[in-house]
Structure formats: structure tokens, C-alpha cells
Amino acid sequence: MTSLNGRHAEKTIDMPKPSAPKVHVQRSVSRDTIAIHFSASGEEEEEEEEEFRGYLEEGLDDQSIVTGLEAKEDLYLESQGGHDPAGPVSTAPADGLSVSESPAILPVSENTVKLLESPAPALQVLSPVPLALSPGSSSSGPLASSPSVSSLSEQKTSSSSPLSSPSKSPVLSSSASSSALSSAKPFMSLVKSLSTEVEPKESPHPPRHRHLMKTLVKSLSTDTSRQESDTVSYKPPDSKLNLHLFKQFTQPRNTGGDSKTAPSSPLTSPSDTRSFFKVPEMEAKIEDTKRRLSEVIYEPFQLLSKIIGEESGSHRPKALSASASELSSLSGLNGHLESNNYSIKEEEGDSEGEGYGSDSNTSRSDHLKPTEDASKEVEPKGSQASSLKDLGLKTSSLVLEKCSLSALVSKEDEEFCELYTEDFELETEGEGRLDKTLDLPLKPEVLASDGVALESEDEEDSATEHQELPVKTLGFFIMCVYAYLILPLPYYMSGLFLGVGLGFMTAVCMIWFFTPPSAHKHHKSLKALRHQSTRSLDIKEPEILKGWMNEIYNYDPETYHATLTHSVFVRLEGGTLRLSKPNKNISRRASYNETKPEVTYISQKIYDLSDSKIYLVPKSLARKRIWNKKYPICIELGRQDDFMSKAQSDKEATEEKPPPEKELPSEDLKKPPQPQEGTKSSQRDPILYLFGRTGREKEEWFRRFILASRLKSELRKPAGVSGSKSGLLPAHSRHSSPSGHLSHSRSSSKGSVEEMMSQPKQKELVGSVRQKMLLDYSVYMGRCVPQDNRSPHRSPVQSAESSPTASKKLPEAPPSEEEEQEAWVNALLGRIFWDFLGEKYWSDVVSKKIQMKLSKIKLPYFMNELTLTELDMGVAVPKILQAFKPYVDHQGLWIDLEMSYNGSFLMTLETKMNLTKLGKEPLVEALKVGEIGKEGCRPRAYCLADSDEESSSAGSSEEDDPPEPTAGDKQPLPGAEGYVGGHRTSKIMRFVDKITKSKYFQKATETEFIKKKIEEVSNTPLLLTVEVQECRGTLAVNIPPPPTDRIWYGFRKPPYVELKARPKLGEREVTLVHVTEWIEKKLEQELQKVFVMPNMDDVYIPIMHSAMDPRSTSCLLKEPPVETSDQL
């Protein structure tokens, strides 16, 4: 504790005031609170102090200055020298601040008060402070001058007594309770000086208001440190508040009532019972303190209510920091905080924040009553509310466990500026924001999935079955029985109770014996089943299905060939089919990872599929060929008169504009007009023939065409003919384009407003029709498929450039999956296929299947047919390394299996080159091939349609794409290439034919030497031994939605295959590396064409029913327009 005499203060009045770091320790007007002011510059504060002194000049009496520092504060003031505004620079060397465990008792004069500190529970280590420090750290330098005088010249009356030992460092007590310092300026100025750099940026405030805000916050910061020693809640009575207070309390108080200093922070020390004033005087001073407290806190509460009204709509993303709430809590005004944890850190919703919110409410309720007596007029604080910011965004993690002064000094100016401008509104909003922060982690738990919710319901049902015994009821009955046996009841009463009890027990026994014991359980199971049945898979089919297909104008099985088709981009939206023709054809076969075609569209046709007939051609297709991509889907369009006539009226104006496809930006270029094509199509295209690029894609298109053809008839039943309401036009505009009219004005066959308004109804109700068909299927599959893997990202991704099954995302494998989980499947398959690998019967069956495939491979006409001479199916079957969880989407059930094969499958193929056929007519040889196949002159495609014979392989020359003609080239006439499906030989074979038909070659073959050599070569067999040593990849198994009888399988990406090809020429083995590598590469390409997605192979299952199955009672056969059973 330091005290300064008046002479020393008088001596220092005339000293200059340089700008230097300084500390002011100042007493308030009410003599209840001190404030410590630390300033690094000391310039801006002086002007403000002079302004503030003008407000304090009224009603000030002679007051003594008792200057001191809080005992519990860690005073780490690091200024290197400076002057007090009212005192000279200290010159005595500072040895550091000594720590005293005993109360610091210093000599005092008549106008000086003693301050006794209670013994410290723990020593607070203080860092040494240089002597060059401003007052408070030096013995000779004055600490502060009193602001209670009217001017600097009047400071003689508020004298400062010197220290008891001027030559020594000040002795600071390390007590846990804070000292009652007798200056109103110091601590008030501390925060103010730290915030002055930020304040000039904001709108200026009245001096009184600014002093009030700063003083309140700084006093709060000081008061919170007092509770360090109060580890338990302790609230001393008013009679005990006379401890450690000053005699100056007895001086007359100001009558102006404009004290804007901080409220009282009375010091209490339970361990010290000594008093330095009389009780009556203390009681009078307590009343004065209460009055001033009510005056001080009334205006902040009014400001708080105003801020809440203005800032109610503001957004604060972060919760309060703990220290901000504690410092802003009005409980600090009375000095009764019950918490000793003070820290400034970011709130993460921990338990620390819950306590301070409750403390704030408790202490605030205690101080609401004195505010009712306040009569201060509240000044407008609109400018204050406009400068508020979010405190949580910049609150640092500085720990202020003991509210050390060093921590306050090290804080940024901006942080304290925000603190004192937001302390009042944060007080009431902090608790609410904290609760919101704590509730955030609980929200995901509420949003549970359907499967989890149902499981919780089942758990609740099972819990009800195992309820606790009705203890109260049983106790009541036991008491009744006990009373019946003990109490002396009359005989008639006893007989009545006995009869009632026996009747009740008889009824219970009757119910027990004659009621089935499982009735209740059955009821529970039905309830659980009903809950489970309502859980269906969220299968969402895309509203728009688009992809590439092949179209032919007229289909005749006898003359059809793949080269007669042309590519079209198909877009199916509701019941509208849009066909866009590119300027050049793309590949007729979809392949893995194919590039996006760069095409422009030259024409477009739009059809309405309502009431159309969808079926497959040719008639009587064999079951195994239903989804063969070589056979088209036939769409016999319904009545298109109104539809096409409306399109024709708009065709001339929109012929050259492309379809609205986002994927193809180049479609706006090079669109030559073809005005006569639309007219011909309206008369010539009542039937469309479309080929799928893969078998799986063909089945998908067929199913969607069926749904589209029945869409309008389904809509007419519930909705009538109300599809052309004008109110539906905006909805359609959102689906198609910003302007519904522009979206269709670009098309070449459709542009009428009536048709645009009729389509939205189809779009809105298309989901209901699909849901009607898939309802039971979805519920059934919902019980079979794990619910946690039905997310949309697992679904196959539709590719507009290739097909709906062009590219699919592989589900990620859970890391916990291990091979042991599939061990039972591998063991079962291995045991079942034991006989398959070892018995000759099954080897012959497989050989026959392979031979049928080989017989359909198109070879040059001078080579004989491929034959299988050797087959070794190895010693193992494919093994499932990992099975991914199944999932269901709009294309059906998907199961992904990680497969591996190491069985050394081996087969040997043989053929011969018949060079004697060179130079002869290929057509004659083709006819001979027809005789060998016992097909006569019937085209191969027509003969195979209704037979179980294998069709040509995927790599046959029939499917090879010859050089595509441009848009202006004429398509070849049907049948121009002969009976063999219009097959055209390759360039190499045509070149060979030219050579063999030349006169020179014919003359050379007539010589005996060459004839002999040709016969030797023709009789030499060509052998090719192929061994599959290893195959590993992810196999996707797909079962489409019902009705279907197919299981489709294919690899997600090209598998790793290790092939060994060993060609032989007679008895010689060809060892040329280039030859063997070329053969192996061709075999891998052949495998990729058949088994790599989007190409998938299929297996039909007899127990499943397809749409063309006469046994089927599926919804696709109920509609009369779809006469697939009659056609097939």
C-alpha cells in the first residue's frame, strides 16, 4: 500500500507532462472504488481527463488520496520509463516488487486511511519492475494525482502522503482478495487507454457516457479478482462490510447525483476482524453506496434494453467467451461472485460456459431491485449500438486464471474496445447463445435415417413387452389380502370378499387357458411388420432418359445389316420422344471409357408416345435373343395428326436450330436445312425401329418406352383432360428453360404453346405412375437390402454420350470387410463345382457351347471354320474376394463382387487355310457356307431369330464399323450386298481379291510347283493354344426391375487378364513375339467387347418372368396397346 503526502503532490504539480508510459491509481468520487490506468503513450488520455474533470467539479470535497495496487494482480508493467502527469520521473533504483504474506500496514496521517490485507493463501510471484517505471513501481515517483479536485492547482487539498520507506521498493501484498483502492481514475483509465486506438474510428460519444462504460468494465475486471480466496460461496452480511474500508466514507457525499464512476467493490476478509471506523458511520456509507450503485446500473440496463431492441435481428455465429460473460455480469457490481475461474477462451460448448450463464442470471436478479429506485435520465445510445461487433470472432485464448494485470496489459486494444462496447448486450444474450452452441451436436442425432428410426420403434415395442412389475398394484392387493386375514370382519363381508377374489382368479385362469399364448406377441409382430412394410426404398428414376441409339427406316430381317442404320440421339421426357440426327454416325457399339462424340445435329424429330404400341421384332424371337442388340425395338406410334401438324407449322422457322442439349455445345454449327424431311417423316414414320448399343441398354429403353406409352392413359384416369391449364406453364418453364417458348422454338418439329402446356402435367404425375408399379417392389427390396447403402451416389451414372449404363461408379469397399466373410460362399461354390471341373460330361457341354460360338465367327472365305480340339477347365473356380453391399436404384438391384481366378483355363483352337479358294467368287463361297450351316439361302439373321443356335460373336466383321459416310452420302440400298446380310469385306480382303483375280496370279497358280505348295499349306493345320492363367477384377451383377427374367453381369472396368497364346503351324510352334502379342491383344479386346461395361452378358432364369412371358401377370401386359405377347 502506498500513500502520498500533500507536499509531494504539491511539488509535482508544476512538472512537465511528457508523453511516456504511465500508470494512474485513482479513487472514485464515491471513495468506493479505485481504478488503475496504464498508458503506453500518455498523450490522448490527458485531453480526455481534462474533459472529464469538468463533469466532476461539482460537489467535490477535500479528499485524501490513498493509492495502492491490487494485491492479487500480477503487475507485469513493461514500460521502460516515463513520467506521471502529476509527478516527476522516479530516480530510485527498483529492486523488484517484494511479496508479503502478512498484511501491509503503512503509517498514515490524519487524512490517510489504513488498509489491512488478509493473509494470502498462496504467494503470487511478481516479476521485478524497473525503477524507471511510472508511478506504482517507484518509491519516489507519485502514483497518481486525484481527479476529485477542480483543477490541477487545487491538488493540495487532495494531498498524497509519501511512502513509509521512500528509498525502498513498494511492498505489495499477495492476498487473494483485492485491495479497496481509493482512486476512481486508475483502473478506469487502464482499459480506456487500451481502447483509444480503436475508438477514434467510431462515432464520438459523450464524455460522460464513455467514462461510464469504461469505468464499469474496468471496475468489473478489478472486482472479479477479489474472489480468488473464496473457494466456497460466501456472502457476508452488511454488518461485516466494515472490514478494510476507509475512514473517508464518513465524508459528506456529493449531492449532484451525477457520479459516473464504477460501482463499489467492497473488500471482505473473513480472517481479519479489525475495524477502523465506527459502525454508524459505516451504515450510513453503505446506504450511500447502495444509492450510487442503483444510479450506476440503471443507465446500463436502459442501454441494454435499447441494444437488445436494435440488435435482435443480428446474427452471431459464435458463443460468448467465458471471461467476457463474467466481466459483463452485473454480479460483479456487488462483489459477490461465486466463481474463481476466469479465462478468456473460445467456447466450444463445454461445461465451463454453463456455470457462468447461471451465475449471471442469479446475480442479475439480485440487482434488479435497486434499479427501480433510480431516477437518472438515460441518454440516447444509438451510436453505441451501431459500433457493436461480434466478440466471439476475435476473442483470444488468453488464460486469465487470476485476472492478472499483465494479461490485461498484453491484450490487444481492439479486443478491449469490443469488450466494453458489447458487455451489456452479451450479458443477456450469452446464455441463449451458449445453449444454442451446446445444442448443435445434438441435431444430427435427431435426424436419423428411416432404418434407424424403425429399429428404435422396434426396440420400444420390445421394451414394452418387458415392462417392470406393477409394484404399486401388487402392493395394494397384498395389503387388501393382509387386511382381510387380520381384521375381524363380519361373516357376510368376509364371504363377499372371498367370492370376489375367487371370481377374479377364476376369470384370470379362464383367460390364461383359453386365450392363445402368442396372441399378444402376434399383435406386436404385426405392428412391427406394419412399420417395416412402410419402409420402402427411395428409388427415383430420372425424368429424362437420354442416350445414343441406332435407327433404321425400314426393317426387314432378310435384308438387314448393321451398316444400314444411322445414329440418333434419343431423349425421352415424359411421353415425348425426341430424336436428334447428327451430321455423322458414331460407333454402333458402346465401349468402355469412350470419348464424347463431337457432332452437330442437322435435324430433329419429336413424337408423342401416348397410346403407342411397343414390341420387339422379328416375330418369335428365341428367348435367348430377346435383348440381343442386333434386333430392334419397334415403336408403332399412336395418332400423331394434331401433334405433327402443330410441329409442321413451326418447322420452317426453326429448322436450323439445335435441340437444347447442354452436353453438346457444338450443335449450333453447320445445320443445313432439310425442309422436306419433316414432311416425309410425318407420313413415312408411323413406325420407328431403334437399336440399342448394348443388350442391357436395349432392355432399359424398352421398359421406359412402355412406361411412356402408357403415361397419358394413366393420367387421364385421375386428372381427366386438364393437362392444358395455363397455370402449369411456369412450372414447365423451370424444367426446360427460362422461357418455355424459347425452349421449344429451337426444336425442328415442335413449338406449339398448347403442347408445351400439356407436358407439365405429365412431368408432375410421371412419378406417381412409376411409384404405382414399383411400390410393392420397393417395399420388398427394402427388406432385403441394407438401408445404409441406398445413397444416390452409389447409383450408376447415366452417360448421355453412350448409354444409360455407360459408366457407373463403383461402391467403395468398407475397410472392415475381410475375405473371411465370403469364405462360406467360396466353399459352397467350390464344393458344387467339384464335379463340374472333373467330369467329362460337363467338359463336353462347355466344349459344345464354345464351339457354337466359334462357328459364328466370320473368317476370311479362304479359311476353314474354327474348331475346338482341346479343353481343360483347370483346377479352380472363380473366387469371391470381397462382396460389396447391394443397393437398388432405378435400374434394379446391383451387387459388386471382387473376383479372382487362378485356375489355368486352357483351350486349343484349330483351323486351316484353303488357298485353293483364292480368286474364286466370294458369293459362291458364301452360298456354300449357307449349305454347310444347313440354312439354304436364308439370311443368317432371319434363320437365327427363332432358333437356339448361337449368334455371331461380338467381334465379328458384321459389327465392325466401316468408314462412315457423310451426311450427304447416300445410304446403300437394301439387299445390294447379297443375301449375307449385306456384308461388305474389308479393304485388306478387297485388295487380296484384286491380286488373286489378276491374270498373273491365275497363271501362276496353274503351275505344278505352286499347286503343290498351295496344297501343302492348305493341309497344314493352324493351331492356337490359349491359356487364361489369371483374371482379376470387379464384377457387377445387375437384375433389372420387374418384369424381367435376366441377370446381367459385366466388369466395371477392364479386368487384369494374363493370357498366354502359343500359335503352332503344323508341328511347328510359332515363337515370334510380335505374333503372340498381337493374338493376345486381340483376345483381350474381344473379352472387353463382351464383358466390360457398358457391355454386359446375360443369363435368363426360368423362375423369373419377363414382359414377353405369357405366364406373366405383370403390369406391362395389362394394357391393350402393348401387344407384345401377340407379336412375339
Swiss-Prot record:
Residues 364-380, 645-671 have a biased composition (Basic and acidic residues). InterPro entries: SMP_LBD. Residues 130-186, 736-751 have a biased composition (Low complexity). GO terms for cellular component: endoplasmic reticulum membrane; nuclear membrane. Residues 1-28, 71-99, 130-279, 345-387, 645-688, 716-765, 787-821, 945-981 are annotated as: Disordered. GO terms for biological process: lipid transport. It is a multi-pass membrane protein. The keyword Electron transport does not apply. Glycans are attached at residue 593. During endoplasmic reticulum (ER) stress or when cellular ceramide levels increase, may induce contacts between the ER and medial-Golgi complex to facilitate non-vesicular transport of ceramides from the ER to the Golgi complex where they are converted to complex sphingolipids, preventing toxic ceramide accumulation. This is Testis-expressed protein 2. The lineage of its organism: Eukaryota, Metazoa, Chordata, Craniata, Vertebrata.
